């Protein structure tokens, strides 16, 4: 992985290897510059949470086990799409927010809410699509409205 963006390259490289070690097919399509108007720690939080969740879910899938990652930067906006296979149904809480299915729920289930909070820093959005059984898609858009350059 060599996009020139060290934060993204490191995280994607780590999760690609972790997925493949678990027998999960990992595909990525990444088109981003070295510098973007988003803090590296924020992009790391989003990517790390999404890819960790995807790897955990895909590992439990019965048939196809895959993760597909697309990251695109265009006109100061960043689009991150993660698709993955999973088994079973999603559990939703109040407000349709996803809930963890892990037994130790008190120590889990903070990933997607933290992704939402981070996206909101950039007036961004998080959309989840699980309309197709066994196929989960999450889309995160960050808007680079500031003229300040952040690396």
Task: Indicate where each model-derived feature is located.
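Conserved short strand/loop->alpha-helix "switch" segment adjacent to the catalytic nucleotide/phosphoryl-transfer site
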Residues: 4, 27-46
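Short beta-to-alpha transition helix within the HATPase_c
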Residues: 4-22
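Conserved ATP-binding N-box helix of the HATPase_c
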Residues: 40-63
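Short beta-strand/loop element within the Bergerat-fold HATPase_c
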Residues: 66-76
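Glycine-rich/acidic phosphate-handling loop/turn and adjacent ATP-lid/helix
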Residues: 78-109, 149
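Glycine-rich nucleotide-binding loop
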Residues: 88, 131-139
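Glycine-rich ATP-binding loops of the HATPase_c
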Residues: 123-130
